[in-house]
């Protein structure tokens, strides 16, 4: 890792035995960025290998079970054409297969869950089905090979190039080494940056490095945003679905963070934007017509009413009797885990963090079922049923933890608070890049961190994604394809969201494809006027929006 020191390249000897293969572009990590990168490579006629640690592609949207955090203009502009197609195909899946009410079916902007966090809250399995269908023609044509349940364990470098990556098959322990002229790191934590010795940053930079007002005085690589094991719930009155008491329940029931207004397992929590103590409400299966729900983060964060905040199936959008409960996704302040950093303390540290995060979410569920205060004066909601059938697990938790912050490349261009924070650039300001390869918009949203920081949630402006943020300073053929691009601990807070991750992956895949077709390297594309113009035209043809109209930050 690198905050004060630089990581140097190291060659890793190839392991004996195992499977060996070659492709045009190796994409390690099958989240939204990896999927978008694979589509971009295959659309251009090149071959790709896409790997994924879990057995589900889609990352945030599927295996991590996080409904998309999106900006208020998402239905009009501000995302790539392929991301818009993904959203519309999810809607069409519901229209084709679900017993929607006629008035819901006819909505052009159908929100299947009627959640308040997003204009498109949907079940992880539906998003997975759409992603698999979208990739299917490329797999059938032999352009795309997908290796699920594979994790990178070694990178093989020569000079300033990554020549191959060795992956471990998590099902049987075998090794598979893939050689490729271009390697994309789409992992959730930027794993390849560490394995390949690519110069990178982890955690919080010192304020002096970029003069960011919200950076700490001292750099701290172990100061990272908390992770979350999301879980899916439905509620069935009169039934008892209480789980076994989690092993660490006593600890979490009594846990009081120093910056919290009371116990973490409670309905009183800070407002992320003001840090004032604000009560949350919890009412399973409310009678409010879901057609009356508005999802607009610029007007209302939507997080005060917990059941509807991230609801992914609204029973009242469907014909009477089709579903006896909504399904909601629990990704709340109450189950953010920040006791131990996920990255930077080796495999043992990773295991501790994942175990702690799982125990916290299970403890929250048990508390909800047994001790949570009800509006009628009673305690507990034993009818809460964990929906492992929705998340693809036995316990109802997501397959993987939601990771907000990764290792980040030391990039040719680093996006800092001075490029995006509204109080620094004004409501219509922000840096405009001649090499922009996409756009995004979201508040700078930092969750409580392993360094003891409370929320940092501040206004930002609609921003651009510079090509330079996808280029490592030294390594020539590895590209970031997710939240590991050239941002800071602070600006990661607005560049980590679903549509931005997709855009970064799509741009990285398109860049690798362009370099293969033109016989150039990524840094040449940015440095040479003709190459840059040709590449940007390629993005324009593919429907990648690179600049914003005149819209105000929030």
Q: Predicted regions: what is each one?
A:
Residues 156-177:
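Conserved beta-strand-loop-beta-strand element in the redox core of flavoprotein oxidoreductases
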Residues 19-31:
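Beta1/beta-strand and adjacent pyrophosphate-binding region of the FAD-binding site
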Residues 3-8, 16, 60, 148-149, ...:
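Flavin (FAD/FMN)-binding glycine-rich loop and adjacent Rossmann-like elements that form
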Residues 4-5, 14-15, 46-47, 52-150, ...:
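Conserved N-terminal/central alpha/beta ligand/cofactor-binding core
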Residues 41:
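Aromatic pocket-lining residues of Rossmann-like dinucleotide-binding sites
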């Amino acid at each position: 890792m690198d905050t004060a020191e630089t990581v140097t390249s190291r060659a890793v000897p190839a392991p004996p035995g195992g499977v060996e293969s070659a492709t045009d572009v190796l994409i390690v990590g099958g989240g939204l960025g990896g999927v978008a990168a694979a589509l971009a490579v295959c659309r251009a006629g090149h071959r790709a290998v896409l790997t994924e640690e879990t057995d589900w592609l889609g990352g945030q949207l599927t295996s991590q079970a996080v409904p998309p955090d999106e900006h208020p203009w998402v239905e009009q502009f501000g995302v790539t054409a392929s991301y818009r197609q993904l959203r519309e195909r999810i809607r069409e899946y519901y229209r084709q297969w679900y017993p929607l009410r006629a008035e819901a079916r006819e909505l052009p902007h159908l929100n299947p869950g009627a959640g308040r966090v997003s204009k498109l809250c949907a079940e992880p399995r539906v998003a997975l089905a759409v992603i698999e269908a979208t990739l299917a023609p490329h797999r059938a044509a032999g352009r795309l090979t997908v290796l699920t349940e594979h994790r990178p364990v070694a990178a093989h470098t020569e000079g300033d190039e990554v020549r191959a990556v060795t992956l471990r098959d998590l099902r049987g322990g075998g090794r598979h080494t893939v050689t490729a002229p271009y390697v994309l790191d789409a992992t959730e934590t930027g794993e390849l940056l560490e394995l390949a010795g690519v110069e990178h940053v982890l955690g919080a930079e010192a304020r002096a490095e970029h003069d960011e007002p919200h950076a700490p005085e001292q750099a701290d690589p172990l100061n990272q945003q908390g992770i979350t094991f999301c879980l899916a719930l439905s509620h069935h009155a009169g039934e008892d679905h209480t789980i076994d008491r989690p092993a660490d329940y006593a600890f979490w029931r009594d846990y009081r963070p120093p910056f919290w207004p009371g116990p973490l397992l409670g309905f009183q929590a800070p407002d992320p934007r003001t840090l004032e103590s604000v009560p949350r409400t919890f009412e399973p299966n409310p009678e409010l017509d879901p057609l009356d729900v508005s999802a607009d983060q610029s007007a209302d964060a939507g997080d005060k009413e917990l059941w509807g905040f991230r609801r992914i199936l609204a029973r009242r959008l469907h014909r009477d009797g089709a579903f006896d409960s909504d399904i909601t996704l629990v990704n709340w302040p109450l189950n953010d885990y920040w006791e131990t950093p996920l990255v930077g303390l080796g495999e043992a540290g990773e295991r501790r963090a994942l175990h702690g995060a799982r125990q916290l979410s299970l403890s929250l569920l048990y508390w909800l079922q047994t001790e949570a205060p009800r509006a009628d004066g009673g305690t507990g909601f034993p009818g809460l049923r964990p929906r492992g059938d929705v998340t693809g697990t036995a316990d109802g938790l997501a397959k993987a933890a939601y990771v907000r912050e990764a290792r980040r490349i030391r990039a040719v261009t680093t996006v800092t608070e001075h490029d995006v924070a509204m109080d620094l650039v004004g409501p219509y300001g922000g840096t405009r890049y001649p090499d922009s390869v996409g756009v995004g918009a979201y508040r700078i949203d930092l969750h409580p961190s392993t360094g003891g920081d409370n929320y940092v949630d501040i206004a930002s402006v609609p921003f651009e994604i510079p090509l330079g943020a996808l280029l490592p300073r030294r390594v020539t053929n590895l590209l970031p394809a997710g939240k590991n691009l050239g941002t800071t601990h602070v600006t990661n807070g607005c560049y980590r969201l679903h549509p931005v991750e997709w855009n970064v992956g799509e741009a990285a895949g398109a860049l690798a494809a362009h370099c293969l077709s033109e016989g150039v390297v990524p840094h040449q594309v940015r440095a040479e006027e003709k190459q840059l113009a040709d590449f940007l035209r390629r993005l324009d043809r593919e429907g990648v929006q690179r600049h914003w109209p005149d819209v105000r930050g929030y």
